[in-house]
């Protein structure tokens, strides 16, 4: 952890204020390395573990560098998954809260028309998955003429998921005069080639862990036949009694099967895989993040980009077939300086996958023998007690910064020739209110939304009921959340 403070980076007071509200005390190692170079607008290739504060390392400079006055997108962030796109958009919104930075997330299986409408509004930063971003570019609904900054996040995962061709197609459409940042946990040849082809003399930054995986994770291997996996899973979880655990399966069918069996055994659990509708996936991840349940059964869709710091255990119910996936899965634990455990089940026919993984991570995973019946019985009472305990809901790390914000609805927008500056000018004249109390402003054709910060919402709402904007008296009320 760096001894530096974020105020050492010559950031605007609005960004520093947001970081303070988010509880960012000191830059992590990756933030300390990346932010100063990014603020100089130099291209960057960053090799860094997940869970290292990476999103803020590009989110902070992006929010600092974009110009609020410009209405068209100035930055594009590409992510491999929808979950990560939403997560990054939320993080950027919170970092840029007091600078009134407007971020939009675009991804598949979400209505295109709604995204098109959002992109017509003032938007500073667009975060999205490659397929949907390319759709918007091809249909002319994502303006690129003012784009100055590109971030490719989780580049190795883009490669694994077959998105590199789409990423290249997107880059070919972007202005050549731009700054590009590429982030990856690993740097396979195709990712290196991407940086050589599309980047301008990039600065390379590598945040070294002890080997490929962090030394905060304790790795263990259990040999088991397929039919006895479920029994072993129940024994291991009884002994370990984890606070928060992800159980990874190779297929959606296996996820469904394991989830049903654990649910039947009264485990506080849920599941996530690519076959579920998007809203359900988001809801499951949000509940898991808040601690509403302790066991998440998942395919690799959940292995990247989910910002949850306190996962104590990862169990590979099915050993991953790709060595990189082992790093990505186990990287869900041992984050943000916490320790964690990574437990892997292996059947007699899967040794070749294990050999590849061990060669890749640079050490042999210690083998263990499954718990005895006596050991399981000894821990059963404590396990059962925790199983039936009321969940402790975790505090949302964004709660403090979002406290005291009221979103106001006005029944007028572009068609009444109303602009963001009109709201700022009018509201800032209210006694006891300044421009710093005004957050993100969204102006649509017939309606507008204005965030009022610092607990000043009720005052502004009361005054604006009898105050005109550009000579027009608009209806105003608190927006429905």
From Swiss-Prot:
Region (Involved in 23S rRNA binding): 406-481
Domain Helicase ATP-binding span(s) in chain numbering: 35-205
CC annotations in GO: cytosol
Pfam families tied to this protein: DbpA, DEAD, Helicase_C
Keyword NADP part of the UniProt annotation: no
Induction note: Induced at 10 degrees Celsius.
GO molecular function: 3'-5' RNA helicase activity; ATP binding; ATP hydrolysis activity; RNA helicase activity; RNA strand annealing activity
Positions contributing to ATP binding: 48-55
Main location as per UniProt: cytoplasm
Sequence motif: Q motif, positions: 4-32
GO biological process: response to cold; ribosomal large subunit assembly
Residue numbers covered by motif DEAD box: 153-156
Disruption phenotype: Wild-type growth rate at 10 and 30 degrees Celsius, no change upon exposure to H(2)O(2) or diamide.
Catalytic activity, reaction form: ATP + H2O = ADP + phosphate + H(+)
UniProt keyword Hydrolase present: yes
Superkingdom per UniProt: Bacteria
Domain Helicase C-terminal: 231-377
Keywords on record: ATP-binding, Cytoplasm, Helicase, Hydrolase, Nucleotide-binding, Ribosome biogenesis, RNA-binding
Location in or out of the cell: Cytoplasm
SMART domains associated with the record: DEXDc, HELICc
Function summary: DEAD-box RNA helicase involved in the assembly of the 50S ribosomal subunit. Has an RNA-dependent ATPase activity, which is specific for 23S rRNA, and a 3' to 5' RNA helicase activity that uses the energy of ATP hydrolysis to destabilize and unwind short rRNA duplexes.
Similarity field: Belongs to the DEAD box helicase family. DbpA subfamily.
The record's note on its domains: Contains an N-terminal domain that binds non-specifically to RNA and a C-terminal domain that binds specifically and tightly to hairpin 92 of 23S rRNA.
Name by which UniProt lists this protein: ATP-dependent RNA helicase DbpA
Native organism: Bacillus cereus (strain ATCC 14579 / DSM 31 / CCUG 7414 / JCM 2152 / NBRC 15305 / NCIMB 9373 / NCTC 2599 / NRRL B-3711)
